[in-house]
Amino acid sequence: MQLNSTEISELIKKRIAQFEVINEARNTGTIVSVSDGIIRIHGLSDVMQGEMIALPGNRYAMALNLERDSVGAVVMGPYSDLAEGMEVQCTGRILEVPVGRGLLGRVVNTLGQPIDGKGEIKNDGFSPVEVIAPGVIERKSVDQPVQTGYKAVDSMVPIGRGQRELIIGDRQTGKTALAIDAIINQRDSGIKCIYVAIGQKASTIANVVRKLEEHGALQNTIVVVASASESAALQYLAPYSGCAMGEYFRDRGEDALIVYDDLSKQAVAYRQISLLLRRPPGREAFPGDVFYLHSRLLERASRVSEEYVEKFTKGEVKGKTGSLTALPIIETQAGDVSAFVPTNVISITDGQIFLESNLFNSGIRPAVNPGISVSRVGGAAQTKVVKKLAGGIRTALAQYRELAAFAQFASDLDEATRKQLSHGQKVTELLKQKQYSPLSVAEQALVLFAVEFGYLDDVELNRIGTFETALLEYANYNYADFMAELTKTGNYDDEIKNTLKTVLDQFKANVAW
């Protein structure tokens, strides 16, 4: 086809008219060094603290050090193929993770990507991992309980919704077991759970996921994994990712429980990053802001007011408070609670459950030391029936420990002392509990009633466990409606007291155990 000169000029004019000049400003820089997951970048002028920097190969780094002539960033993922001279680019975005109900029942990594082989996740949106905690006015006091199902915890160190309760102890003292049982006990309570595994073996995490599935608790739990094989950056960020997922429920007037297992390993990961970034080390080589590392995380666990929820949901949810309860775990070395990270977290939290290796090794499990375990705000949230009946437990144990130490040196003891020692031994025996067998409020109330009103006085020490099992079986079979109602209401009055008395009287009179 032949075109004459006029047609050609018309075509060129038409193309020129259609041409648009698109100016796209990109903030790019160049990698000048790569070492141990830390990259130094030259040429990024408008980068924010914590901003995501796009790397070659669909990967990201997070800007942590903003210096005069370079930026120190930590790589999220493998870094072995990164080299000097590679070009990187600012994204203008802070790290966000997917949030929503679609994450329940799933196992995800720090960035919210599924790692359980169950396909894609339908999330409800994204949330920044770093959020400022609710202010004083937006909060509400803690007055609703979180039942762990453990007699020793719910009676002596009760936990409320919106509280931060530290679980602290040496390795192999049952810290994770206590937290996992607390999650299992929420399967029918409506509390959504998030379990954040930091620096653990993949086999250990797989075992936890399997146990949650076996006990029907995985369907309302999100498992966030930053295993020992992951980079220090992902281990450092995992708790913040899990917290953002929990805040989704809190801000919509629901209740959530988050377990950080454990924050000692997160602090070590952060120390590694800080030293590689050449930040000045302080006590135990931790950086100066290691307190802020944990305080800004744990302050996000709170109970928020109806007004806060209504404002956040733009009026969709009215008259509901939301809560995020945190159970951070800290591992101590040879029972040293005065080390840097343990003292920091103790001062941030609203109480601690101290697990002792001596108690654990002598068969007292959960190995809760009632002398130094406290709950600073949970007392107001304790159910009425447990609060009323558990009053004498801590006193009995304190007196028993004092007398037991004294009795080692005394040859003959008077009747009153012998009675107190026997009572203390029986209370200690009764507070023992197997893993994966949480008790309901009514079951705990019945057992505590038996202690409080002397029903164990004629029971031999080695028969306490058998007595308890038979009593609970009898009550759940013959008084099922009463037990269900007591668990639901948690009230305590003369009528309930008389019914509990009747249950125990009839059990002791008619049942052989």
UniProtKB/Swiss-Prot annotation:
Membrane topology per record: Peripheral membrane protein
Subcellular location(s) per record: Cell inner membrane
Key word Nucleotide-binding present: yes
Upper classification of the organism: Bacteria, Pseudomonadati, Pseudomonadota, Gammaproteobacteria, Pasteurellales
Ligand binding (ATP): G169, D170, R171, Q172, T173, G174, K175, T176
Any single GO CC term annotated in Swiss-Prot or TrEMBL for this entry: plasma membrane
EC number, UniProt record: 7.1.2.2
Marked site positions, Required for activity: S373
Family, per entry: Belongs to the ATPase alpha/beta chains family.
Family annotation (HAMAP family): ATP_synth_alpha_bact (MF_01346)
The keyword S-adenosyl-L-methionine is assigned to this record: no
EC class: translocase
Catalytic reactions of this protein: ATP + H2O + 4 H(+)(in) = ADP + phosphate + 5 H(+)(out)
Pfam hit, one: ATP-synt_ab_N
Subunit structure as annotated in this protein's UniProt entry: F-type ATPases have 2 components, CF(1) - the catalytic core - and CF(0) - the membrane proton channel. CF(1) has five subunits: alpha(3), beta(3), gamma(1), delta(1), epsilon(1). CF(0) has three main subunits: a(1), b(2) and c(9-12). The alpha and beta chains form an alternating ring which encloses part of the gamma chain. CF(1) is attached to CF(0) by a central stalk formed by the gamma and epsilon chains, while a peripheral stalk is formed by the delta and b chains.
Protein name per the record: ATP synthase subunit alpha
Principal location: membrane
Organism for this UniProt entry: Histophilus somni (strain 2336)
Functional summary from the UniProt entry: Produces ATP from ADP in the presence of a proton gradient across the membrane. The alpha chain is a regulatory subunit.
Top-rank taxon: Bacteria
Keywords from the UniProt entry: ATP synthesis, ATP-binding, Cell inner membrane, Cell membrane, CF(1), Hydrogen ion transport, Ion transport, Membrane, Nucleotide-binding, Translocase, Transport
Molecular function per GO: ADP binding; ATP binding; proton-transporting ATP synthase activity, rotational mechanism
